[in-house]
Curated annotation (Swiss-Prot):
Origin species: Oryza sativa subsp. japonica (Rice)
Comp. bias regions, Basic and acidic residues: 166-184, 197-210, 219-312
Alphabetically ordered keywords of this record: DNA-binding, Metal-binding, RNA-binding, Zinc, Zinc-finger
Keyword Ion transport set for record: no
Region annotation Disordered: where it falls in the sequence: 153-312
Gene3D superfamilies: 3.30.1370.210, 3.30.70.330
Cross-referenced InterPro entries: Nucleotide-bd_a/b_plait_sf, RBD_domain_sf, RNA_proc/Spliceosome_comp, RRM_dom, RRM_Ist3-like, Znf_CCCH
Protein name in UniProt: Zinc finger CCCH domain-containing protein 25
Length: 312
């Protein structure tokens, strides 16, 4: 919950209790009758323990002030815990100072039910505990920014002689995470034929001139020649690929594809027109044939009738 919202809610509860005339036994303060500590939040960072004493001493005698500070920098974190000699002074402090402005900031004051005072530990004991926990690996790398609040040892001599890499190696789950050799991403491979390593010819000449020595030298030179040919072929393929992927070539390919598509579309439309004309010619020819056949049939009928009449 927002601290300002908590301040307003506490003020509303106090106003309602005052209007209703609720006594101490029925008040919400009665839940904290066993604690003489109050929490103070929203403190300006410039305030010190003496300033807090001057502000809160007007409602009772303050016996303990714990202004929480950062262990590394020593700067205030903006909140504190105060203890009164009389527990009833906490009620006055909460009712009157909750929501008050101190150096332009609204201060929140509330009861603390169970406050456990942190025991001050000796610096030697803290150092022993840090040594028992182990070495700060972030400090070894120069990345630890916790300062004195770090729970691990910052002893430079011990950090230099720990050999923490072996510990990391023992905890590594996968084989490639172990520190036997640099990772593959850190290795340098030859990028051209000139950077490749080949057997030294002088060393090969120093070998015995026997049959085995001659065969080993010839095999080494054969391997070198094959690797050179392979690297030359790879460079040529790379250049050809770059030429194929050039913008001018891709633009020309697109233009040729567009021309080929337009030519195919024109041929298809021309073929369609010729088929339509052919179908129309077939329909006219079939219509003419049917008309002529009917005409010849009628003429044959007339001739047969005329022949019958003449025979009668």
């Amino acid at each position: 919950m927002n601290p300002l919202t908590q301040v307003k809610r506490t003020q509303v509860i106090n106003q309602k209790e005052a209007l209703l005339g609720i006594g101490e036994d029925g008040s919400w303060h009665a839940k904290f009758k066993d604690s003489a500590y109050v929490f103070v939040g929203g403190i300006p960072y410039d305030l010190t323990e003496g300033d807090l004493l001057a502000v809160f001493a007007q409602y009772g005698e303050v016996v303990d002030v714990n202004l929480v500070r950062d262990k590394g920098t020593g700067k205030s974190k903006g909140f504190a815990f105060l203890a009164y000699e009389d527990q009833r002074s906490t009620i006055l402090a909460v009712d009157n100072l909750n929501g008050a402005k101190v150096l332009g900031r609204i201060v929140r004051v509330d009861h603390v039910s169970k406050y456990k005072k942190k025991e001050e530990e000796d610096e030697e004991e803290l150092q022993k505990k840090r040594e028992a926990r182990g070495v700060c690996y972030a400090f070894q790398k120069g990345e630890c920014n916790r300062g004195a609040s770090c729970r691990y040892s910052h002893d430079e001599q011990r950090n230099a002689n720990t050999g923490w890499g072996s510990k990391e190696e023992s905890k590594a789950r996968w084989e490639h995470d172990r520190h036997h050799e640099p990772p593959m991403s850190h290795k340098k491979f030859p990028s051209s034929a000139g950077e490749q390593r080949f057997p030294d010819r002088a060393k090969e000449e120093n070998k015995s001139t026997g049959r085995e020595g001659q065969s080993s030298r010839s095999e080494a030179y054969k391997d070198r020649d094959s690797r050179l040919r392979h690297s030359d072929r790879g460079s040529k393929d790379h250049d050809r690929y770059r030429h194929d992927r050039s913008p001018e070539r891709s633009r020309g390919d697109r233009q040729r594809n567009n021309d080929r598509y337009a030519q195919g579309r024109d041929e298809k439309s021309e073929r369609y027109r010729s088929e339509v004309k052919h179908d129309e010619g077939d329909q006219k020819r079939s219509r003419r044939d049917t008309d002529s056949s009917g005409h010849y049939e009628r003429r044959g009928n007339e001739d047969s009738e005329r022949y019958r009449k003449s025979r009668r």
